[in-house]
């Protein structure tokens, strides 16, 4: 006959210890909590020189704010496909112009509400012609996006143009 102490010892040898159970429950809770975060955020790496930072967290579905970073889907024009591929990653730029703002150009300088924001180049680094972007009042639900970099590819050029709400992925925060 087997003593009750031996039976209890054998049974407890096959049961997980409380710290292991708590660790598994904690990891499951962390996983479920990050699911919601992941559905609302992206982590993007900048592969160009147009912004000084190279890593961003993007909060999906948030509206652009003047002076802040916003990320958007670009049109698939021949120039964009030639430089960024058939499925380019979202572009990140600073919001320079909001709906109703006025965009003008003089001596290849682009201004928003009279403040210079970007210099216009005639040719890309590869020698392709760059058509100037739109001028006038920024339409409702659209934005003028830019970067301080002289080779920035943004709303100053027709291939990007106005960036409208349907293109917006979200707003970004620099990480690195």
Question: Which positions does each model-derived feature cover?
Answer:
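Structural motif
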Residues: 67-70, 101, 142
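Mid-length scaffold segments of soluble, non-membrane domains
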Residues: 86-117
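A short, sequence-level motif marking secondary-structure junctions
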Residues: 62-63, 119-127
